[in-house]
C-alpha cells in the first residue's frame, strides 16, 4: 500500500499492481484512479476498483487443463482430492471453476477438498492426510500449484501411493518438471510468464501515452472484458499449456524455461 501511495505522490502515469490480497488495496487504488493514474492489475484482480486493464494467464483454462489431464490419466474414473490455493486469491476461484466444469460429465468424484491459506505448502500435506482418512481409494489429486503438489507427493510417497495416483498442478516449477519425468507427478500447467510480462509492459506504455488499447498493435489488442465484481474492465488473457512427460522437451526445454540437464537430473 505504501508503494502505491509513493507512486501516487510521484504523479506516475501508470501503476502496475500484483495484489496478494486484492480487497486490501481497494482504497489506495481508488485514490490512484481519482488522480487520473492508469491502474493495471497484473496476474491477480483487485475487485471493484474499475482498473484500466486486467492482464493474466487464463486461469479458468488452467483449471480446465487440470481436469482434462486427470480424466485422461484416470480413464476408469474414481475418487480424487482437490487441494486449492489461498481462498483470498481470486485466481483460485477461476481455476476451481474451470476444474469443476471440466469434471462435470466425467466419472471422477471429488471426495475431499480444501484450501491452503496464503498458499502454505504444509497445509497441502495436511489436506492429503485428511483426504486419505476419508478414503485411501484415490486415483488423483489436483493441487493449486506445484509447491502444494510437492507436499502432496511427499504424503503419497509416505503411503506408498506415489506414482500410482495422478497428480496435476500448475507453474512448471523445476521440481515439478523433475517429478513429471520421474513419474510421481502427471502434469503441470506452464504459464508463459515472459509473454505476460512483455505484454503488460507494452500495454502500460500505450495506456500512459493515451492510446486506444483495443486497437491492434504488434499483434496485441484488448477486446475482452472481465467483471471485477462491480465493473466490466478491459481484460487480456494469456493461454496456458498442459505439460506432461510427452511434451516436456518441446514446451519446457526447447522453450528455454528449464534446461534438459536440470529436468532430467535424477533420470538415469
Put a short name on every predicted segment.
Residues 1-268:
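A residue-level marker of the well-folded mature domains of exported/periplasmic proteins
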Amino acid at each position: 500500500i505504501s508503494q502505491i501511495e509513493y507512486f501516487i505522490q510521484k504523479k506516475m502515469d501508470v501503476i502496475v499492481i500484483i495484489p496478494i490480497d486484492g480487497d486490501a488495496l481497494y482504497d489506495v487504488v481508488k485514490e490512484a484512479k481519482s488522480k487520473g493514474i492508469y491502474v493495471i492489475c497484473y496476474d491477480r484482480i483487485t475487485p471493484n476498483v474499475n482498473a484500466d486493464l486486467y492482464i493474466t494467464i487464463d486461469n479458468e483454462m488452467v483449471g480446465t487443463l487440470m481436469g482434462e489431464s486427470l480424466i485422461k490419466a484416470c480413464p476408469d474414473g474414481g475418487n480424487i482430492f482437490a487441494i486449492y490455493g489461498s481462498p483470498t486469491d481470486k485466481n483460485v476461484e477461476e481455476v476451481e471453476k474451470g476444474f469443476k466444469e471440466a469434471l462435470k460429465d466425467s466419472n471422477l468424484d471429488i471426495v475431499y477438498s480444501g484450501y491452503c491459506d496464503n498458499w502454505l505448502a504444509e497445509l497441502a500435506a495436511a489436506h492429503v492426510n485428511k483426504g486419505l482418512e476419508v478414503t485411501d481409494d484415490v486415483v488423483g489429486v489436483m493441487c493449486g500449484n506445484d509447491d502444494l503438489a510437492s507436499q502432496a507427493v511427499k504424503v503419497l510417497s509416505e503411503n506408498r501411493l506415489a506414482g500410482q495416483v495422478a497428480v496435476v498442478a500448475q507453474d512448471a516449477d523445476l521440481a515439478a518438471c523433475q517429478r513429471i519425468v520421474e513419474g510421481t507427478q502427471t502434469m503441470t500447467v506452464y504459464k508463459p510468464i515472459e509473454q505476460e510480462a512483455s505484454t503488460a509492459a507494452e500495454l502500460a506504455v500505450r495506456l500512459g501515452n493515451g492510446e486506444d488499447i483495443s486497437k491492434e498493435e504488434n499483434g496485441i489488442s484488448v477486446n475482452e472484458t472481465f467483471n471485477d465484481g462491480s465493473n466490466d474492465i478491459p481484460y487480456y488473457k494469456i493461454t496456458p499449456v498442459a505439460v506432461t512427460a510427452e511434451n516436456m522437451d518441446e514446451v519446457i526445454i526447447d522453450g528455454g524455461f528449464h534446461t534438459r540437464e536440470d529436468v532430467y537430473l535424477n533420470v538415469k
